[in-house]
Amino acid sequence: MTQLDQLKQFTTVVADTGDFQAMRAYAPHDATTNPSLILKAVQKAEYRPLLEQAVRDARSDSVEDIIDAVLVAFGCEILSIIPGRVSTEVDARLSFDTEATVAKAKHLIALYEARGVARERVLIKIASTWEGIRAADQLRAEGIRCNMTLLFSLAQAVACAEAGVQLISPFVGRIYDWYKKDAGANWDPIAQGGPNDPGVQSVLRIYNYYKKFDYPTEVMGASFRNISQIVELAGCDLLTISPDLLAQLQQSDAPVERKLSPDNANAANIVRLPADEKSFRWHMNADAMATEKLAEGIRLFAADAIKLEALIEPLRAAA
């Protein structure tokens, strides 16, 4: 049995790509996209017709409306391949604007529903800022499910759980990157790999906290750098994995054992944390890694959104 098939016994496998042709071979249950992945996909020749059709379907001169149409077009194509849910991301430039995030999420869901897609099959991705979490809380009350992304700390995870969000995406690889860079020449890949990988440990803490205190919010590990990180999180609710790493899992038959479980979480000695705004901001301020990676992630996604706009502009002008 391949590592991928073994992993699927413990964890829902999600494809992390906008390239829906690439995910067919791995039979994922769900899929996630983000501005960077969509930007990468739309530059491939095989997706040019989809891009041009989305521009026509938008029936708008607004680049913002056209990009929303492109995101939903890719999401619909992905949903024709997978049995589960697709995650579509709100513009990162709205990360500190609760009202605008809510409005954008409602608009994206309306576009999906206009194409016959039930809102239950769509997760709206929102950056895990305080303002983003408040938006997710409002959206939950209106039946719109959210995937809280750019999550790097337990403080963010606790705030999301208290808001009753559907799912969170802690970023394993980016946490690993920060600690590796911070350690410099003192980084020991053996001592700080496997179960001691700082990204793996972060997800383990969050998973155990959620299960210990019976939060229904799903935990989906994301942003992996290697197979070891994935295998160490076998048993996590979901793991979203790039096509390259899915291919490696499919080509290996090395054993995969369950590492995360509700039983282990319930046996752990865990202190409950406050989830109010001042506690959230204090804990984020005290966590240099989480603060820096959240800010960096928002900047990177915003930059790719701007690049996507530049790519769309000539198509809009020609339509």
UniProtKB/Swiss-Prot annotation:
Function text: Transaldolase is important for the balance of metabolites in the pentose-phosphate pathway.
Record-level Gene Ontology MF annotations: transaldolase activity
Origin superkingdom: Bacteria
Active site: 125 (schiff-base intermediate with substrate)
InterPro entries in alphabetical order: Aldolase_TIM, TAL/FSA, Transaldolase_1, Transaldolase_AS
Cellular component, GO, one term: cytoplasm
Entry similarity comment: Belongs to the transaldolase family. Type 1 subfamily.
Organism: Ralstonia pickettii (strain 12J)
Gene3D superfamilies, sorted: Aldolase class I (3.20.20.70)
Gene Ontology biological process terms from the UniProt entry: carbohydrate metabolic process; pentose-phosphate shunt
Reactions this protein catalyses: D-sedoheptulose 7-phosphate + D-glyceraldehyde 3-phosphate = D-erythrose 4-phosphate + beta-D-fructose 6-phosphate
Enzyme Commission no: 2.2.1.2
Subunit-structure text: Homodimer.
Protein name per Swiss-Prot or TrEMBL: Transaldolase
Compartments it resides in: Cytoplasm
Keywords: Cytoplasm, Pentose shunt, Schiff base, Transferase
NCBIfam families the record matches: PRK12346.1, talAB
Biological or metabolic pathway of the protein: Carbohydrate degradation; pentose phosphate pathway; D-glyceraldehyde 3-phosphate and beta-D-fructose 6-phosphate from D-ribose 5-phosphate and D-xylulose 5-phosphate (non-oxidative stage): step 2/3
Principal cellular location given in the protein's record: cytoplasm
